[in-house]
């Protein structure tokens, strides 16, 4: 994401520290209110409901041993009601607890990444922040190599990293410190690569144009983005083809209802989600959130490239978008908020499915969680990139000369949105 040449004062980086601390405080506050506050109340309600369930089960057992048929039926009805209350109380607790924990972790990561931008730019001298026309040519960057190397090391050590984290959480696993350290080193190198990329990008270099076939005359990074998106299409096509191939061999409730088989042998996520508005609601909200976020990223690009931008005559809009620079920043912030909502609701939904016994251990569960998890990871990576874009919009700013950065990211974000529009009906409704 290229930028034009600007004079960025060193005191600007102090603002990033304050914002990072604010993000960290917001995440901890959300955890305290949602998970620690409301979550604790919901947990107490769940414990009470579970106690009532145990009592009703004992009464049902007694009725089965010595009671009449009428008493047995009455006891069974009481147990069923208590069971429904217990399940609802458990899911309510998971909703608040998972939301609080997710927001806390997300905002800690946000604070770290936003702080990285300030750190890597604050170590530059004032002269480096302001480069003249003689230094406009960009001679290449080590950032892609650093980021690729960091990702490689992280993935090499990832199995050991997961096992070690499980061991530290008290589960019955032996820590694998070799894998954990390998992933940790990879993470550090990845962050260094990202920080160096941000430092280089903020200075701004002219957009490089391809000089040979087949992309002659085209912006190099735009062509690169399209090639990257083609590879991403192949990744998600693999998920879809696996799901559709296996789905044809499953006897699901949908297949039974259609008369294609007689006995259900596989429960899919859609079997648990599509029959009730409340269970389907998180996925539906996420669909609209991503569609709206595609619109807001376009508005950010439009504001950046509109040389005749004028403040709205509407009082509310004028207050939200008082200047062209702040309009770009605020549209990006709205996009981040919508994407963050997607991640929170996704993990809340996951917690409900796991609580109901739909886990990654089953074939249907593995396809569902891997596909939606991979998509969620793409959303989260996009949110981290947008953090830098917000940082840049708030400092040097975007305009008609450097707005292609938003345009290229917008291509990625639209792809992520379109992927979800395909995932939602296939995995939630079918």
PLM regions and their residue ranges:
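...captures the hydrophobic TM-helix bundle architecture rather than a specific catalytic motif
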Residues: 2-68, 76-430
């Amino acid at each position: 994401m290229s930028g034009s040449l600007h004079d960025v004062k060193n005191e600007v980086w102090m603002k990033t520290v304050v914002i990072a601390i604010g993000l960290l405080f917001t995440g901890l506050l959300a955890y305290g209110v949602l998970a620690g506050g409301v979550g604790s109340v919901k947990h107490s309600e769940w414990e009470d409901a579970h106690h009532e369930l145990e009592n009703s089960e004992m009464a049902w057992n007694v009725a089965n041993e010595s009671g009449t048929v009428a008493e047995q039926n009455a006891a069974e009805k009481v147990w069923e009601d208590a069971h429904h209350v217990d399940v609802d109380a458990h899911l309510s607790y998971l909703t608040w607890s998972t939301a609080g924990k997710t927001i806390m972790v997300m905002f800690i990561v946000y604070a770290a990444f936003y702080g990285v931008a300030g750190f890597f730019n604050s170590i530059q001298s004032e002269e480096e922040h302001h480069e003249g026309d003689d230094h406009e040519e960009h001679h290449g960057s080590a950032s892609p190599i650093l980021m690729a190397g960091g990702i490689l090391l992280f993935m090499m050590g990832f199995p050991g990293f997961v096992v070690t984290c499980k061991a530290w959480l008290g589960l019955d696993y032996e820590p694998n410190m070799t894998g954990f350290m390998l992933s940790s080193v990879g993470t550090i190198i990845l962050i260094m690569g990202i920080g160096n990329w941000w430092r280089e990008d903020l200075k701004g270099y002219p957009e490089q144009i391809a000089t040979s076939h087949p992309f002659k005359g085209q912006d190099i990074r735009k062509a690169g983005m399209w090639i990257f998106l083609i590879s991403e299409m192949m990744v998600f096509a693999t998920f879809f083809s696996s799901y559709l191939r296996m789905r044809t061999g499953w006897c699901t409730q949908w297949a039974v209802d259609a008369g294609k088989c007689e006995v259900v042998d596989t429960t899919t996520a859609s079997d648990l989600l599509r029959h009730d508005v409340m269970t389907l609601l998180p996925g539906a909200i996420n669909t609209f959130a991503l569609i709206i976020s595609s619109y807001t990223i376009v508005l950010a690009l439009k504001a950046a490239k509109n040389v005749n931008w004028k403040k709205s005559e509407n009082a509310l809009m004028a207050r939200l978008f008082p200047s062209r620079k702040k309009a770009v920043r605020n549209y990006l912030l709205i996009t981040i908020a919508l994407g963050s909502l997607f991640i929170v609701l996704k993990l809340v939904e996951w917690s409900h499915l796991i609580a109901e016994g739909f886990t990654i251990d089953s074939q249907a569960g593995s396809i569902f969680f891997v596909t939606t998890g991979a998509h969620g990871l793409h959303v989260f990576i996009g949110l981290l990139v947008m953090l830098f874009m917000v940082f840049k919009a708030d400092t040097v700013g975007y305009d008609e000369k450097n707005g292609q950065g938003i345009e290229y990211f917008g291509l990625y974000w639209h792809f992520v949105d379109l992927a979800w529009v395909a995932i939602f009906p296939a995995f939630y409704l079918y």
